Amino acid sequence: MRVILLGAPGAGKGTQAKFITEKFGIPQISTGDMLRAAVKAGTELGLKAKSVMDSGGLVSDDLIINLVKERISQADCVNGFLFDGFPRTIPQAEALVKAGVELDNVVEIAVDDEEIVQRIAGRRVHEASGRVYHTVYNPPKIAGKDDITGEDLVQRKDDTEETVRHRLSVYHSQTKPLVEFYQQLAATQGKPKYSHIPGVGSVEVITGKVLEALS
């Protein structure tokens, strides 16, 4: 089971990724984790990536693709893998095809922007304990105060509406073409299977739809 999971920040990808990896016994691979692991292991590619990152540069697609090939050749990928947040761009997707990396499924978890803004911008955090509340879905007993200590709750900088909308616009500009790329690939080559899943409703309902798409 070789899967790409697409979805905007706040669409609930993390929950579904955890379910898929546990259900099929496959690792979740994100480029960030992969880069850190390669750097830590001191592989030739890892050292190359480190020198680029140390000088403040962006790791090239070529290097990323080679790291991906190195990563998916490891023993834990024998039953497949789940790419999380990769590929991000058309050149990366094209390079994957060119490198002969086979994929079975591309699953997009789609949630309306306004729903995502409400989900994320409503989060409030008690910094000392890490307890998370939501102004609509899980409000504290007293607005703006932690239930246990009574201390102030804060909104993280990443959770402000302005930041969320910016991240969404970046996601759409990068990912919309990717969706079309994989739809086209599925239509012309029959693989990978592309599935569009509405990410609203209970976790169980969405998980059921994901499972159906992967079967």
UniProtKB/Swiss-Prot annotation:
It catalyses: AMP + ATP = 2 ADP. Pathway: Purine metabolism; AMP biosynthesis via salvage pathway; AMP from ADP: step 1/1. Residues 122-159 are annotated as: LID. Its EC number is 2.7.4.3. PROSITE patterns: ADENYLATE_KINASE. GO terms for biological process: AMP salvage. One of its GO terms (cellular component) is cytoplasm. InterPro entries: Adenyl_kin_sub (IPR006259), Adenylat/UMP-CMP_kin (IPR000850), Adenylat_kinase_CS (IPR033690), Adenylate_kinase_lid-dom (IPR007862), P-loop_NTPase (IPR027417). It comes from the Bacteria. AMP binds at T31, R36, G57, L58, V59, G85, F86, P87, R88, Q92, R156, R167. Pfam families: ADK, ADK_lid. Catalyzes the reversible transfer of the terminal phosphate group between ATP and AMP. Plays an important role in cellular energy homeostasis and in adenine nucleotide metabolism. Belongs to the adenylate kinase family. This is Adenylate kinase. The lineage of its organism: Bacteria, Pseudomonadati, Pseudomonadota, Gammaproteobacteria, Pseudomonadales. The gene is adk.
